Structures are given as C-alpha cells and as structure tokens.
C-alpha cells in the first residue's frame, strides 16, 4: 500500500483538547478525526486495526459456536416499552419520531431486539441453545462525551446474546464466553483482569467485567524505549528525566473504573462489588454502663475520636438514606465509607439518595455528627457487619453536642440485619485469604451477564420444555467495546522514545508500539529520497518480496523531507521500519524494531530473516 494514496493526516503537535494519551495519539498519528462532540471518523489506519480486532473476535467466537448476524440500529420504542426500559433507561437514550409520529430509538444495546427475533422464531427447547452476536454501531447520548473513543455518543460494540432452556446450558455458555474473551484480550496483548461486577441497569444475576489496567505515571521504565546508543535509563540526565516525567504528568490516567485485586492471589472485583476478609470476633468483652457525654464542636469521626481519646474503630457512624419511598438508617464503623451499590443491591431498590441535613433534623431532632441509633423508633436500621463486632461503642446521642459511650447492640439499640455495606480499603486481606488488596485504574473493555429471565419474562419469550410446559427462556448477554478497545490498547502501548544525538543531546517523543497482531501494517518501507532511482527500485523489490512472505507493507512514497517521514513513521507505530537510504545502490538498508528501539544495517538478502529474528 502506498502512503501517498492513504488518508493519514498526522499532526506536528498533540491536540490541545485531548486529556488522555490514547486520544492525543489517535488524533496526532492520523488514526481518527472528530466529526462532532463524542462522534469520530475512523480513518484508514484505525479501520485496519479495528478490522483485525473484529477478525480475532470472529475466530474465537467460531470456536464456541457463536453465529454472527446484523440487527438494525433504528429500533421501535414498542419493544423497549415491553421490557420497561424505555422509561427507565434515562437521558442517555436517543429518542426520535418518524414522519408518522411513531416513537423510535437509536440502539445503545439490543436485548429487546434479539429477544423479539428469537421469540417469534423459536417455540421449543429442541431449538436451544442459540448463541448469536453482532459487531455494530451503538448510540448513547452522553451528557459529557470525553476522553476520545473512551466515552462517546457513537461507538462500535460487539454484543452477543444466548438463549437457553435450562440453567446448566446458560452456565456453560457464560463460561465459554469468559474463556473466549480472555483469549481475545490475550491475543490483543493487553494487561487485563476479569473482575466481579455489578449488573447495573442490565439486570440479571451474575456479572463479570474485563478491565484493561492503565498504568500510573511513576514507573518510567515501563514508558521508555531507548535508542541503541543509550545503554540504560541511568545514562539519561536528571533534567531530561524530569522533562519526561512532566510530559507524562500532562495526561490523565485513563479509566473510569477502580478495580480491586489481590496481590499474590486470584481475587479481583470492581470497587463497587469488592469485599475483604471478615472474621467475626468471638472474644468476650464485658459490656460497660451506657454513659452520655458532652462532645462540644465534635462532629466528624476524627473530631469525636480525638476529643474522647479513643480509636476511631470504637465509633459508629450513622447515615440516613432514602431507598425508593422508605427512609433507612445505616450504621458503619468509624471512618468506613458506605458503598452505595452494595446498599442498592441488598435492598433491591431502584433509587437511593442520602437524606438532607434538614430532613434529618426534622425527623430525628439532631444534625449529622450527633446522630445515633439509640432511641430511634419507626425506622429501619441496617448496619455493616463490622458494627456487630464493636463492644462499648461511641455513637451519637441524637442531641447536638452529645454522644453515648459504651453503646452495645442488643442492649441499647436494635439492628434489623448486618450485611457487607462498606467500601474496602487498600491493604486489607482478600476475602479468600490469599493476598492483600491493591487498587488500580482501568478501562472496561468487556462485560458478560447472566440475565436469566429479566427480558424473556417481560417480553413473553417462552418455549415448551421437554414436559410440554411453557417456560421463559434463560438469557445471557456478552459485550465488548470494540472502539474503546482501540483506546485501551494505545493506553497500554503508548511509549516515549528517547534518542541521543551525535552531539550527546537527549531528545524524546511519543510513539505507538502496536502489538504485531494488531498493527495496521507489519512493515513500514521508507525510501528517504523518492527521486533516487536506485532507492525506489530497491523499495519496489523489497515490497514485492515482503508481500510474498505474507507481510502487510506500507510504503512511504511521498516526496517529503527525511525528518518528516521519520517523524510520521514513529507516530504511526508499525512494528518494523525499513529505511532505504544512501546505500540503496549497494543493497544495504536499515531495520528498526519499534518495540526495542534496536537498529541494524543489513544486506537486502538478509531482510526477511533479520525481521523474523529481531521480531521474536
């Protein structure tokens, strides 16, 4: 492929509106262009990468018996009314009317559409299981589209759906998809973790996310590729390292998810679902007499602990929440933070919100900071399981400026139930006891759900089972954010290349170090001077030879200065660059391996073998 025939509009500088490095490099290297807020055009290079990702997916889904189809993006609102999501999905749903004033939507996902198709065609368990998927454009009216392809209004998604007559069949397909996803992301070269996740608005029971880990900006060795004349990072002057660190610091760590994983273990979960080891305390502690004490000006846990000279673990914090139409009191230990997702899931609520200060004062006669469980009537009290272990606790007295000491559950106040409601902290023990918990930022690239009968019951998608009974089909749902996967790859494979000039000056620049299986082309042939007849003859010879060996080759046949060509080549980020320069008449070329920065001069006859050896 000739570069002069392609649309690769590189930029000399990083775009000023980019906040994450993947967005900046996709724009600067000419992979994408923004058409409007949250909407991007995938230019030829990006499209080639996306096609390679799609082909990897198709190969792995073929292995598990998933069949590709293509559903419409313009969907009738009637199906979404059947499932109940037309009213509940929220403002992110694109709603529109046709000329007959009928309601339609632009599909953000296709559970209703697929279920409608299946219910109209399948009536017997004998035709199940059915496993279908599509790779198509989706739409979501994001209030604040940002971070390039990571949070857009139009995006490319692979969404799969499976239908089953029994739970064992659903469980088997769910596991098949989990393994297929792991293979896909491994082939993409990603550092990722499958984690326990919240099903959220999708509904259903079991749910697992696949998160691409985004690196911090501290470990320079991860980010740097050194030229062949720099032996180690220690050789780079501190002033240059400081400049590099400053450059790294300009870019946000991408990823809206915080994941929790066990260092030294297998446990991993979204922070919304993460838990830690819980060991009930069986030691006997004498219950002391309840005592009301003045705590003037002490409202926070830290202030109360300091005033009473006690450990914060000896205190109980009282929160008040609206859960749908019910007011609920929540008890937590010390400075533990309430995990609202855990609370929502436990209550089965569709809506929760913290009560206001005014509401609390009107209901209980005290402000937050002096609120406590003793004497509360006609209100539901739920506590985190750690609260049950606290003996002789300090709690608010429901009078501003006062607290109780030596409060004990069962004697001084009642709790309806103790459940896991807290957000875990880094350094706690994994729930399986294998390793300590660490936090990391990450990008959600895949999500699988066991939806059960969430949609099939609502839409009357029934079959006759082996006994002739009418039952709702069981359903699974499996998604991969294909376009955001491109951004996740760049977040992990962006590199800063450091070179030392003949004058002993150190220079650095951003580049993309694409995994070999995903790079838009395998090899970049760069003739320095297109007016040099010997160079162009050798370029044509090498292109033909490399293509004959199965390589995908991009030839920079533009009449540009060498510096422009090399800068663009570095930005584009193909795994191998072959430079055809002044020694072309002798059959000598220069080979540069992007992943390592290694550069060698070789004879043209050694090119194929050299590339194979150096690329391993």
Swiss-Prot record:
Catalytic reaction equation(s): tRNA(Pro) + L-proline + ATP = L-prolyl-tRNA(Pro) + AMP + diphosphate
Q: Which Gene3D superfamilies match?
A: Anticodon-binding domain (3.40.50.800), Bira Bifunctional Protein, Domain 2 (3.30.930.10), YbaK/aminoacyl-tRNA synthetase-associated domain (3.90.960.10)
Q: What are the EC numbers?
A: 6.1.1.15
One Gene Ontology cellular component annotation held by this UniProt entry: cytosol
Supply the InterPro entries for this chain: aa-tRNA-synt_IIb, aa-tRNA-synth_II, aa-tRNA-synth_II/BPL/LPL, Anticodon-bd, Anticodon-bd_dom_sf, Pro-tRNA-ligase_IIa, Pro-tRNA-synth_IIa_bac-type, Pro-tRNA-Synthase_IIa_type1
Q: Which GO terms describe its molecular function?
A: aminoacyl-tRNA deacylase activity; ATP binding; catalytic activity, acting on a protein; proline-tRNA ligase activity; transferase activity
Q: Which UniProt keywords apply?
A: Aminoacyl-tRNA synthetase, ATP-binding, Cytoplasm, Ligase, Nucleotide-binding, Protein biosynthesis
**Subunit architecture:** Homodimer.
Domains as described in the record: Consists of three domains: the N-terminal catalytic domain, the editing domain and the C-terminal anticodon-binding domain.
> Pfam families annotated for this entry?
HGTP_anticodon, tRNA-synt_2b, tRNA_edit
Question: Which organism is the protein's source?
Answer: Lactococcus lactis subsp. cremoris (strain MG1363)
Compartment(s) where it occurs, according to its Swiss-Prot or TrEMBL record: Cytoplasm
Spell out the CDD domains in the cross-references: ProRS-INS (cd04334), ProRS_anticodon_short (cd00861)
What's one GO BP annotation on this UniProt entry?
A: prolyl-tRNA aminoacylation
Q: What is its main location?
A: cytoplasm
The record describes the protein's role as: Catalyzes the attachment of proline to tRNA(Pro) in a two-step reaction: proline is first activated by ATP to form Pro-AMP and then transferred to the acceptor end of tRNA(Pro). As ProRS can inadvertently accommodate and process non-cognate amino acids such as alanine and cysteine, to avoid such errors it has two additional distinct editing activities against alanine. One activity is designated as 'pretransfer' editing and involves the tRNA(Pro)-independent hydrolysis of activated Ala-AMP.
Family per record: Belongs to the class-II aminoacyl-tRNA synthetase family. ProS type 1 subfamily.
Q: What is this protein called?
A: Proline--tRNA ligase
Q: List the disulfide bonds.
A: none
């Amino acid at each position: 492929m000739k570069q002069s025939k392609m649309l690769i509009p590189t930029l000399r500088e990083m775009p000023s509106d980019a906040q994450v490095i993947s967005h900046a490099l996709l724009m600067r290297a000419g992979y994408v262009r923004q058409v409007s807020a949250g909407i991007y055009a995938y230019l030829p290079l990006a499209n080639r990468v996306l096609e390679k990702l799609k082909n990897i997916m198709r190969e792995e889904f073929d292995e598990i018996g998933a069949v590709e189809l293509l559903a419409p993006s313009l969907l009738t609102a009637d199906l979404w009314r059947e499932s109940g999501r037309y009213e509940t999905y929220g403002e992110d749903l694109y709603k529109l009317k046709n000329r007959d004033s009928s309601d339609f939507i632009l599909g953000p996902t296709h559970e209703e559409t697929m279920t409608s198709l299946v219910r109209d065609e399948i009536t017997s368990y004998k035709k199940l299981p059915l496993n279908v998927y599509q790779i198509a454009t989706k739409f979501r009216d994001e209030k604040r589209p940002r971070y390039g392809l990571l949070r857009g209004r139009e995006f490319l998604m692979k969404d799969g759906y499976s239908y089953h007559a029994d739970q064992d069949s659903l469980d088997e397909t769910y596991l098949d998809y989990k393994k297929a996803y792991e293979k896909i992301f491994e082939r993409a070269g990603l550092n990722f973790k499958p984690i326990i996740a919240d099903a959220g608005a999708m509904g259903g029971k079991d749910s697992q996310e696949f998160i691409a880990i985004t690196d911090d900006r501290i470990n320079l060795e991860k980010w740097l590729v050194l030229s062949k004349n720099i032996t180690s990072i220690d050789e780079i002057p501190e002033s240059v390292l400081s400049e590099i660190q400053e450059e790294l610091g300009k870019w946000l760590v991408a990823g809206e998810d915080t994941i929790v994983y066990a260092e030294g273990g297998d446990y991993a979960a979204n922070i919304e679902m993460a838990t830690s080891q819980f060991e009930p305390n069986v030691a006997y502690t004498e219950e002391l007499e309840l005592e009301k004490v003045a705590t003037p000006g002490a409202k926070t846990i830290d202030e109360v602990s300091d005033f009473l000279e006690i450990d914060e673990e000896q205190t109980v914090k009282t929160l008040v929440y609206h859960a749908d139409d019910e007011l609920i009191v929540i008890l937590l230990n010390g400075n533990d933070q309430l995990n609202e997702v855990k609370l929502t899931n436990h209550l089965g609520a569709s809506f929760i919100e913290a009560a206001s200060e005014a509401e609390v004062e009107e209901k209980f006669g005290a402000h937050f900071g002096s609120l406590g469980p003793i004497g509360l009537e006609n209100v539901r009290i739920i506590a985190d399981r750690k609260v049950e272990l606290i003996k002789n606790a300090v709690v608010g007295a429901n009078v501003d400026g006062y607290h109780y000491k030596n409060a004990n559950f069962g004697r001084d106040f009642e709790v309806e139930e103790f459940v896991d409601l807290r957000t875990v902290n880094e350094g706690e023990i994994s729930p399986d006891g294998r390793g300590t918990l660490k936090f990391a930022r990450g990008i959600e690239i895949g999500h699988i759900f066991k939806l059960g009968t969430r949609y099939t019951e609502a839409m009357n998608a029934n079959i006759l089972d082996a006994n002739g009974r009418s039952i709702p089909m069981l359903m699974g749902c499996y998604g991969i954010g294909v376009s955001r996967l491109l951004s996740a790859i760049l977040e992990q494979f962006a590199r800063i290349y450091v070179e030392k000039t003949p004058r002993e000056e150190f220079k650095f620049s951003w580049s993309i170090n694409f995994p070999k299986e995903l790079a838009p082309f395998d090899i970049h042939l760069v003739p320095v001077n297109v007016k040099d007849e010997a160079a162009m003859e050798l370029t044509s010879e090498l292109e033909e030879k490399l293509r004959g060996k199965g390589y995908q080759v991009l030839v920079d046949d533009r009449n540009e200065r060498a510096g422009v060509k090399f800068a663009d080549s570095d930005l584009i980020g193909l795994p191998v660059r072959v430079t055809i320069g002044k020694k072309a008449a002798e059959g000598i070329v220069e080979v540069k391996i992007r992943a390592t920065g290694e550069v060698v001069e070789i004879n043209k006859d050694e090119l194929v073998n050299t590339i194979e050896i150096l690329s391993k």
